[in-house]
Every structure is written in structure tokens, then in C-alpha cells.
């Protein structure tokens, strides 16, 4: 009988302004103060994929986000979906980070979590749409990358990923550990169940700062 590979999955999620509560100043800039927040929509698909792999093969799913203290809100929602662990990366030093500095900090968090099989990102954030954070993080980790994945299967110690494009599809096999970004087509995110909400309320949120991660301050925030 083929051995079942239990999955240790990290899902990186982002807090974005609630699109139903967007306000602009007189210069057309987004007013973030007092605006509600939500999980970046495609990051819910990333969470669902991680949870589905855990449910099928066993293992754990850790949700990670970088941001101010209020970013705990999206981590609570990840716990309510069924994640096993939630980690907030928060430090004033991280403020003003571009995708390069963000990817560096996220890679340090992945290393601190340790010995993971798969890191999953949504393919882009609705408030920026750079689609760079996942690839940059993979680069810092020195791991293979699959982008815009819309279907995935586990094959022993490897994953088989499919991505679609105009006129066809592409399938590739990648050894684990690996980093992938996913599109909304990969699945339909589950709803929060009362049981998962009750369970999630019992779980704490771990907070790591720059020193906890062992980051080089020169590579973080505006300096990075």
C-alpha cells in the first residue's frame, strides 16, 4: 500500500480594504483609516487548497500574514475556516515594504516554521495585483515555483500542477517542498462552520517581530 504523505502547509494571506467600504480623499487616494478589512479573495482559495490537502492526507495548515496588529482579524477568519495555526508578522520595521522586502520577511517566517511541504499564495492581491510576492518568496527560499495553478494533485513526494491559458492547459510535476500561487478556479472556498468557529476561538495567534524572525533590518520595510 502506498504511503500517505502528510502535508505541512503554509498559506500566506493578505489583509485588504473591504471593497464595500472604500472611501477616497479629495486627491483620489484610498482612505485606510476606519475602513473595514477582509481576506484578499483569492487567498481564500489558497486556504481551501491547504485545508483540502490536510483533510485528505493529514497534516497541518498554518496561516501567515504580515501587517499591523489589526491584521489579526484575517487570521481569525483563517482559523474559523479550519486552520491549525495562525501567525502574524508585525513590526514597525516591516512598514512600507515593497514586494521584495515582503517576500524576504515571508521567507524568514517560512524558515522559522520549518520543514514544510508546500507554501501557497493567492496569485495576486486585489488591492495591488503585482503577482510578485509568491515568486519573490520562492526565490528567497530557493524552492521550485508553480504559478497561477488551477488544479493540483499530490503524487508521492511531488505535486502535479495544472495551469490554464488561452488556447490550452499546461501540466507540470514538481518535487516537494515547493511554492505555488493559485487562481480562483482552483476550488470553491468552504464556509465557516459553527464547530470550526468554536474551535478557532480556542486557538491563539502567534506574533513574530523582526528579531523573532532573525531578519536583517536592511532588507525589511522601506530599507529593503
Predicted segments, located by residue:
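N-terminal glycine-rich FAD/FM-binding segment characteristic of electron-transfer flavoproteins
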Residues: 2-224
Amino acid at each position: 500500500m502506498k504511503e500517505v504523505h502528510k502535508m505541512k502547509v503554509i498559506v500566506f494571506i493578505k489583509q485588504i480594504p473591504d471593497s464595500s467600504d472604500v472611501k477616497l480623499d479629495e486627491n483620489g487616494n484610498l482612505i485606510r483609516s476606519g475602513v473595514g478589512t477582509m481576506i484578499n479573495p483569492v487567498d481564500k482559495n489558497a486556504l481551501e487548497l491547504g485545508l483540502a490537502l490536510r483533510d485528505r492526507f493529514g497534516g497541518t495548515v498554518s496561516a501567515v500574514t504580515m501587517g499591523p496588529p489589526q491584521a489579526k482579524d484575517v487570521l481569525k477568519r483563517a482559523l474559523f475556516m479550519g486552520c491549525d495555526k495562525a501567525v502574524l508578522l508585525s513590526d514597525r520595521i516591516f512598514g512600507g515594504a515593497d514586494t521584495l522586502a515582503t517576500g524576504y520577511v515571508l521567507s524568514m517566517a517560512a524558515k522559522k516554521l520549518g520543514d514544510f511541504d508546500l507554501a501557497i499564495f493567492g496569485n495576486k492581491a486585489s488591492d495591488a495585483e503585482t503577482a510578485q510576492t509568491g515568486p519573490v518568496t520562492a526565490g528567497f527560499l530557493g524552492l521550485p515555483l508553480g504559478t497561477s495553478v488551477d488544479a493540483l494533485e499530490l503524487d508521492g513526494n511531488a505535486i502535479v500542477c495544472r495551469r490554464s491559458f488561452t488556447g490550452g492547459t499546461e501540466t507540470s510535476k514538481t518535487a516537494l517542498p515547493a511554492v505555488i500561487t493559485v487562481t480562483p478556479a482552483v476550488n470553491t472556498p468552504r464556509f465557516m462552520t459553527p464547530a470550526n468557529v468554536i474551535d478557532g476561538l480556542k486557538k491563539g495567534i502567534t506574533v513574530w517581530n523582526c528579531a523573532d524572525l532573525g531578519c536583517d533590518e536592511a532588507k525589511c520595510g522601506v530599507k529593503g
